[in-house]
């Protein structure tokens, strides 16, 4: 059996407050696992410990107690991060470099050179849909384009694990949809994704499993479908149902102990509706 992509065991992080005898517990006794190939959503309100957890997994912050592993290797070691790509919230790029030069720069950091580096740069620009902006300076990119070049740099070394902190922050609905589709494409490629986001509708569309943090404590964790299912209700979706059939169903329900709580027409999502009326034909 293969090791989890991410294993977090009894993780605690406490920050002392300087010049005071007080402490802030950012994460408390957190344990969870992200299996290879999953898209895992780490959710919670601001200050719940999401970013702290991500930083500990990436070796950017040391834990007070507990341990984290990446594909079975201690995440504090440099070797464990060879298989990891990271997109932080609000990433900073050198604004006078072009998109192509930016990926070339990160490729060199990852040890790529020559023809392989040039080919990888072209592949990534195509992957994130920025071929036509390859020679434009980063300073002229929109927020959505910056996030996409950020995803491209996270993919430079062909990682098995992507850690994404608010990848759609500040992006309009069209850009958000493009990033969502990229994450789904990563999933098809077998890449594991640990995602932190406040956009719950998007999380519902792309995540296999979620964990919800509140005040540093994991309050809910499991498969998304299991967590959002309402056990006492059953949704019945019919196509081409005649009025007579609906009347028969309602009569059968009336004879039983169940009751019809709601009958309504299917709805699209606000995101889809917005895109339909704002995108050019």
Regions found by a protein language model. Give the residues of each.
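Generic structural hydrophobic/aromatic packing signal, biased to beta-strands
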Residues: 1, 19-21, 236, 243
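ABC transporter nucleotide-binding domains
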Residues: 3-6, 13-195, 200-208, 212-214, ...
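Solvent-exposed beta-strand sheet faces enriched in polar/charged residues
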Residues: 9, 71, 264-266
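Short, charged/small-residue-rich alpha-helical element at the C-terminal edge
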Residues: 224-281
């Amino acid at each position: 059996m293969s090791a989890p992509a991410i294993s977090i065991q009894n993780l605690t992080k406490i920050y002392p407050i300087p010049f005071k005898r007080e402490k802030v517990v950012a994460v408390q006794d957190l344990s969870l696992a992200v299996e290879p190939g999953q898209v895992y959503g780490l959710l919670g309100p601001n200050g719940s410990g999401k970013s702290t957890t991500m930083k500990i997994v990436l070796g950017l912050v040391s834990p007070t107690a507990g341990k984290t592993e990446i594909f079975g290797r201690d995440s504090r070691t440099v070797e464990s991060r060879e298989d990891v790509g990271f997109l932080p919230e609000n990433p900073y790029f050198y604004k006078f470099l072009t998109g192509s030069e930016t990926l070339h720069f990160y490729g060199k950091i990852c040890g790529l050179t020559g023809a392989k580096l040039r080919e990888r740069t072209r592949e990534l620009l195509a992957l994130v849909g920025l071929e036509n902006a390859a020679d434009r300076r980063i300073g002229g990119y929109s927020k959505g384009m910056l996030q996409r070049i950020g995803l491209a740099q996270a993919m430079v070394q062909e990682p098995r694990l992507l850690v994404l902190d608010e990848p759609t922050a500040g992006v309009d609905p069209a850009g958000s949809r493009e990033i969502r589709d990229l994450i789904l494409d990563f999933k098809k490629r077998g890449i594991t994704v640990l995602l932190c986001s406040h956009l719950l509708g998007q999380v519902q569309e792309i995540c296999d499993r979620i964990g919800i943090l509140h005040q540093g404590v994991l309050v809910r964790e499991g498969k998304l479908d299991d967590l959002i299912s309402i056990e006492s209700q059953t949704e019945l979706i019919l196509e081409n149902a005649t009025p007579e059939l609906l009347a028969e169903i309602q009569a059968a329900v009336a004879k039983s102990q169940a009751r019809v709580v709601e009958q309504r027409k299917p709805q699209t999502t606000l995101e889809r509706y917005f895109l339909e009326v704002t995108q050019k034909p």
